[in-house]
Each structure stands twice: as structure tokens, then as C-alpha cells.
């Protein structure tokens, strides 16, 4: 078993019309044993920028603390929030810096940039970025997430339709992966508001 599969995870981000959604499962396990059912994989950097981290749970928490620290330094120096593209480059640089002993996680970054244009990207554990204009996935359920998202995604969805689409994709995918699941955690971000919702899924 790969170390990336040790704790199990499923993270997906999807683009809508001037909005985006990012969702994850809530299970923290040690291989097939469930440890917690309310694990937080998605974290807010600021109101228009979120990061989801799949992979080894210890590295997820360590990397998140380092990213919050770097973003606060940026805010103090620049007196503004970081743009999503800048933040993605920062994450990539931090991961690549540790390439010989990498953080064992795969980030999914989603944010609203200039003119409220949504930005999503993912990268591997050493910071190789993969940009997308529709959706990005990571985690142990990524194979089934790709299939569900390709079947359900359509461009320029409004916020409510986007929430419904990403939720259905996530729930149907984690049912096909025994290392992730136990409900879902969804953020839908528009220029005016952030909606956070908890999904109830199969509890096994």
C-alpha cells in the first residue's frame, strides 16, 4: 500500500459561473480502521481562497500550518490577500523545496481571482502544478471522482447547481472507495458569500 493511501482521502474542486466549489470526505483512517469521522481536509486561507489537502494526515496538518504562516507574512508585508495564482506558486515552491523528503500530500487549490474569475489547480507531492478549467481531484477516490465529474460537469453552473453536482459526484465516488467516505464537507464560494455544508453519506 502506498503511504498516500494510509489515511484515505477524497478531495475535489469544481468551477461554476463566477463561483467555485471545493469538497472532501470526512473519514480519517489507518488503512481499514476508522479513527475519526470529522476530519477537516479543506482549509480557508482567506474568504476567496481555499485549499484541500489529501494524503498523509500528519503532513496535511503540518503543511497547512506552514501555509497559513506564509500567507500571514504576505498580508503583513503587502497589506492585501494573496491571489490564487500566487498562492499556488507558493505551495508549489514549498513542496519542491522538500523534494528529497517530501510532504506526503497532494493539494487542491481553489480561489476567485481578478474579476471574480475562478481558479483551480492541483499538484503532486513535489509541487508539479496541473491547472484546469473544469474540475480537479486528488486522494484515494480520485479514479472514481474523475469518472463522476466528467459525467456530471457542465460549464457555467450557478452556485446551487454547482453544489448539487459536486455533492453527487463526491458521494457516488466515495461509495466506490473503502478508504474514504463517512459523509462530505462542501464549500461553495461566490464573490458575495461562502456557503459551508456537511453531507451525510453512508456510514461504513
UniProtKB/Swiss-Prot annotation:
One matching Pfam family: Proteasome
Single GO BP term: proteasome-mediated ubiquitin-dependent protein catabolic process
Chief subcellular location: cytoplasm
Localization of this protein: Cytoplasm; Nucleus
InterPro entries membership: Ntn_hydrolases_N (IPR029055), Proteasome_beta_3 (IPR033811), Proteasome_bsu_CS (IPR016050), Proteasome_sua/b (IPR001353), Proteasome_suB-type (IPR023333)
Gene3D superfamilies: Glutamine Phosphoribosylpyrophosphate, subunit 1, domain 1
Entry keywords, A to Z: Cytoplasm, Nucleus, Proteasome
Organism superkingdom: Eukaryota
One cellular-component annotation, GO: nucleus
PROSITE patterns (UniProt xref): PROTEASOME_BETA_1 (PS00854), PROTEASOME_BETA_2 (PS51476)
Residues passing through the membrane, by range: none
CDD domains hit by this protein: proteasome_beta_type_3 (cd03759)
Subunit and partners: Component of the 20S core complex of the 26S proteasome. The 26S proteasome is composed of a core protease (CP), known as the 20S proteasome, capped at one or both ends by the 19S regulatory particle (RP/PA700). The 20S proteasome core is composed of 28 subunits that are arranged in four stacked rings, resulting in a barrel-shaped structure. The two end rings are each formed by seven alpha subunits, and the two central rings are each formed by seven beta subunits. The catalytic chamber with the active sites is on the inside of the barrel.
Family statement: Belongs to the peptidase T1B family.
Task performed by this protein: Non-catalytic component of the proteasome, a multicatalytic proteinase complex which is characterized by its ability to cleave peptides with Arg, Phe, Tyr, Leu, and Glu adjacent to the leaving group at neutral or slightly basic pH. The proteasome has an ATP-dependent proteolytic activity.
Name of the molecule in the record: Proteasome subunit beta type-3-B
Gene name of the encoded protein: PBC2
Amino acid at each position: 500500500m502506498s503511504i498516500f493511501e494510509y489515511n484515505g482521502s477524497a478531495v475535489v474542486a469544481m468551477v461554476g459561473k463566477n463561483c467555485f466549489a471545493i469538497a472532501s470526505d470526512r473519514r480519517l483512517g489507518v488503512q481499514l480502521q476508522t479513527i475519526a469521522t470529522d476530519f477537516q481536509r479543506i482549509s480557508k486561507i482567506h474568504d476567496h481562497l481555499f485549499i484541500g489537502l489529501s494524503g498523509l494526515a500528519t503532513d496535511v496538518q503540518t503543511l497547512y500550518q506552514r501555509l497559513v504562516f506564509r500567507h500571514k507574512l504576505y498580508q503583513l508585508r503587502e497589506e492585501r490577500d494573496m491571489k490564487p495564482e500566487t498562492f499556488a506558486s507558493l505551495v508549489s515552491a514549498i513542496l519542491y523545496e522538500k523534494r528529497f523528503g517530501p510532504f506526503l500530500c497532494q493539494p487542491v487549490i481553489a480561489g476567485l481571482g481578478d474579476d471574480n474569475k475562478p481558479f483551480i489547480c492541483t499538484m503532486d507531492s513535489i509541487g508539479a502544478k496541473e491547472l484546469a478549467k473544469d474540475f480537479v481531484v486528488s486522494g484515494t477516490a480520485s479514479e472514481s471522482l474523475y469518472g463522476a465529474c466528467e459525467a456530471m460537469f457542465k460549464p457555467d453552473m450557478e452556485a446551487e447547481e454547482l453544489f448539487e453536482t459536486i455533492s453527487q459526484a463526491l458521494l457516488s465516488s466515495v461509495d466506490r472507495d473503502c478508504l474514504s467516505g463517512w459523509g462530505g464537507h462542501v464549500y461553495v464560494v461566490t464573490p458575495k458569500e461562502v456557503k459551508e455544508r456537511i453531507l451525510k453519506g453512508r456510514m461504513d
